[in-house]
Curated annotation (Swiss-Prot):
InterPro entries given in the database record: PCRF (IPR005139), Pep_chain_release_fac_I (IPR000352), Pep_chain_release_fac_I_sf (IPR045853), Prokaryotic/Mito_RF (IPR050057), RF-1 (IPR004373)
Gene that encodes the chain: prfA
Name assigned to this protein: Peptide chain release factor 1
Biological source species: Klebsiella pneumoniae subsp. pneumoniae (strain ATCC 700721 / MGH 78578)
Domain of life: Bacteria
Transmembrane portions of the chain: none
Record's comment on post-translational modification: Methylated by PrmC. Methylation increases the termination efficiency of RF1.
Organism placement in taxonomy: Bacteria, Pseudomonadati, Pseudomonadota, Gammaproteobacteria, Enterobacterales
UniProt-listed HAMAP family: Rel_fac_1
Alphabetically ordered keywords of this record: Cytoplasm, Methylation, Protein biosynthesis
Homology family: Belongs to the prokaryotic/mitochondrial release factor family.
A single MF term (Gene Ontology): translation release factor activity, codon specific
Keyword Ubl conjugation: no
């Protein structure tokens, strides 16, 4: 491992030890804000510190094994120990390189997830409903909270569009690669000839932004309309114009929110989604520029990019970005998404490592 990387790891390890000592200090415990900040930093440093400690131990094991090679009686055992230690050292080195990759500050944030039916009419709306259920099941498995902000239901079920806020640890970091086009191939319930139809949906995942990072939005650039909520809401539904539709005139972005009975609360939520969408558009524009100079896993950020195909007759799901095919469609639709998410995260990390190597 390069000496510059070892020096960086040593500094992080020392900071980890320093933070650990500070967390046990009475003055820190008395200051709750400082205690929370240091606790977060400690959690962020722990994986690096633990992995670096293991790597240092392996280097010592390698030195010991090399010294044993000079002893004829110990040589065979030393060769085996040396081989095992070097293999473990290589694995730890790879882990440390990944842990040192620049972190996306948005990864730990909550996320807004939008699912929209595309081509395919009623079948696309039904598939949008299936996708949203899939994400909801995945969220439940990770103990995240799902809150529907707006839902435009299809005529025969599913959704023409549904927007939800998903809250929990690391939501955006896990779901951000879901943004893009999702295609389904199956026989619709209304198909009497048994022919397979192809329909499509688009998914957009955006981090929820703290107030301080919201883009500046001029109130004069907004057109705000109120209308009666059309979703489930018990006896009060359709009695007041509590639902909100906000149009950002410079970009043409439109956001609706009809979750709350309070017009004020719906407006606040809609503005939050609007801010996230405006920032997402800016990020996509920047990624498009970066993609012109090197291959970028996220493509141009264009939502028409084809991420996955879900083929029901074959029980197959294919991620076209990394040429991954699994015959475990039923599990995926029940929210077991880590088998699809983890490979794309690893591919992204490999791209980051390659980019860093090019810079060196």
């Amino acid at each position: 491992m390069k000496s510059s990387i070892v020096a960086k790891l040593e500094a992080l390890y020392e900071r980890h030890e320093e933070v650990q000592a500070l967390l046990g200090d009475a003055a820190t415990i008395a200051d709750q804000d400082k205690f929370r900040a240091l606790s977060r930093e400690y959690a962020q440093l722990s994986d690096v510190a633990r992995c670096y400690t293991d790597w240092r131990q392996v280097q010592e094991d390698i030195e010991t094994a090399q010294m044993m090679l000079d002893d004829p009686e110990m040589r065979e055992m030393a060769q085996e120990e040396l081989r095992d230690a070097k293999e473990k050292g290589d694995q730890l080195e790879q882990q440390l390189q990944v842990l040192l990759l620049p972190k996306d500050p948005d990864d730990e944030r909550n996320a807004f997830v939008e699912v929209r039916a595309g081509t395919g009419g009623d079948e696309a709306a039904l598939f949008a409903g299936d996708l949203f259920r899939m994400y909801t099941r995945y969220a439940e498995s990770r103990r995240w909270q799902v809150e529907i902000l707006s839902a435009n239901e299809g005529e025969h079920g599913g959704f023409k569009e549904v927007i939800a806020k998903i809250s929990g640890d690391g939501v955006y970091g896990r779901l951000k690669f879901e943004s893009g086009g999702h295609r389904v191939q199956r026989v619709p319930a209304t198909e009497s000839q048994g022919r397979i139809h192809t329909s499509a949906c688009t998914v957009a995942v955006m981090p929820e932004l703290p107030e301080a990072e919201m883009p500046d939005i001029n109130p004069a650039d907004l057109r705000i309309d109120t209308f009666r909520s059309s979703g489930a809401g018990g006896q009060h539904v359709n009695t007041t114009d509590s639902a909100i539709r906000i149009t950002h005139l410079p970009t043409g972005i439109v956001v609706e929110c009809q979750d709350e009975r309070s017009q004020h609360k719906n407006k606040a939520k809609a503005l939050s989604v609007l801010g996230a969408r405006i920032r997402a558009a800016e990020v996509a524009k920047r990624q498009q520029a970066e993609a012109s100079t090197r291959r970028n896993l996220l493509g141009s950020g264009d939502r028409s990019d084809r991420n996955r195909t879900y083929n029901f007759p074959q029980g197959r799901v294919t991620d076209h970005r990394i040429n991954l095919t699994l015959y475990r469609l039923d599990e995926a639709m029940e929210g077991k998404l880590d088998m699809l998410i983890e490979p794309i995260v690893q591919e992204h990390q490999a791209d980051q490592l390659a980019a860093l190597s090019e810079q060196e």
